[in-house]
Amino acid sequence: MGSKGLKGVMVCLLILGLVLEQVQVEGKSCCKSTLGRNCYNLCRARGAQKLCANVCRCKLTSGLSCPKDFPKLVLESNSDEPDTMEYCNLGCRSSLCDYIVNAAADDEEMKLYVEQCGDACVNFCNADAGLTSLDA
């Protein structure tokens, strides 16, 4: 990899680091029952997450799954997770990968950059940012 390519990868990693720092974690609530889930959803119309979780006997989590005794997973009402993932991937690829591709010296290097940058964007948008790497 030439110095141009290395500079491009470094810039990408720096930008991803800045984006990661600004990502807001979307809260998820886990409730023991459908009744608890409905209680939480109604409460959230006016109440704070922590208050509603306590009143309705739910737990707040930032993970992808709920504890076994809290099986009902609820995304916040303003969440549209599949669209969010799609737009995250699209934005990441268009802003970061385009820059890196322009730094490629030849077609072979460009294909490698496109693949690695695309994989990094997928990992980032699926919350696997700790696993994201552009190294071959």
From Swiss-Prot:
Q: Which residues form the signal peptide?
A: 1-27
Query: Keywords, A to Z?
Result: Disulfide bond, Plant defense, Secreted, Signal, Toxin
Localized where?
Secreted
Any idea which GO molecular function terms this record carries?
Answer: toxin activity
GO CC terms: extracellular region
**What Gene Ontology biological process does one annotation of this record name?**
defense response
Listed InterPro entries = Thionin (IPR001010), Thionin-like_sf (IPR036391)
Cross-referenced Gene3D superfamilies, in alphabetical order? Thionin-like (3.30.1350.10)
Report the record's disulfide bonds: 30-66, 31-58, 39-56, 43-52
Instruction: Identify the SUPFAM superfamilies for this entry.
Output: Crambin-like
Q: Which residues form the propeptide?
A: 73-136
| Similarity comment | Belongs to the plant thionin (TC 1.C.44) family. 4 C-C subfamily.
Q: Which PANTHER family match?
A: ALPHA-2-PUROTHIONIN, THIONIN-2.1-RELATED
What this chain does, per the entry, is described as: Thionins are small plant proteins which are toxic to animal cells. They seem to exert their toxic effect at the level of the cell membrane. Their precise function is not known.
Protein's recorded name: Purothionin A-1
Organism, by scientific name, is Triticum aestivum
